Amino acid sequence: GIQYLASDPTNPITGQVWFNSTSKALKGTTVGAGAWASGGSLPTVAQAGGGAGTQTAGLAYGGNLPGSPAISNKSYSYNGTSWTATPNMNLARGQVRGTGTATAAVAVGGTDSPNNADTEEYNGSSWSESNNFSGGTAQLQVTGTQTAALATNGLPPGSGSATEAYTYNGTSWSDLGTNHNTFRYGAAMFGITTSGVLSGGQEPGSVSSKTETWNGSSWTEGTDLNTARASVGNAAWGTETDGIFVAGKTSTAVVGSTEQYNGTSWTEGGDLATARANAAGTAKSGTTTSGFYAGGVSNPSLTTYTAVTEEWTVSDFETKTFTVS
């Protein structure tokens, strides 16, 4: 029932409701809001690198460096405070994507003149080659784990478009045989191999707000993002009913907005302090209560590089006052 208290409880729990007799207000607690805070800067400025892991055990690797066509094979781990160099990737590349944890990650595709289909796995101490990806390889979308990943096409070598989707079992890639509905690259995806969410990206001639959901057998159109954007980088994570989509570039500007997905619709969350695109981010499946977003570029022409890291945290609860309207 509703408690009658002289003051707000010191340690309320989510869902608790009480009447504050001093302020004459009916109050309750709900799940807290998410916000971004400053983290440790990357040792190397880069954009379009891959990411994996969590806010306290993260991984960032590869990417484009200032002075195109410079690309990186550097790899760094994050402990929630600072970044530490780890063994380099075997192949330097920009626009690489990946997923997994800080000790079991997979990196896929990218550009090294021309686009490549290379797949590498990281085990916490070294990178090793795996079987090549068979689809469009630059700015593709990947989610899941090192041994059960889902990927949708990016930009194929040369010109053209493709909408194939693939799964990875820790050894090789397989074509699902079921294409997603709209060709786009530079989008973001979260979830697992049997339930994923694909949103945003660059369509031919326009920036996309479209969302598609994957149920293990087919793709279905979902609710559009509130803000259409591409050049998202490795910057979405969560599940098909609880996901996060961060930052990117609209047709005219780089944005820092965060949107949260509940399985049906998108809600605006807290903004990054530094709006940017093409950053490395946390793993693509798992909890949405914390994460990181590191590096990237902060201007619309995608030429101003930054090493900034920001950390996303959702508080356990917040107190709300009930009102009558």
Model-derived features: where do they sit?
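Polar, enzyme-active/binding microenvironments
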Residues: 1-325
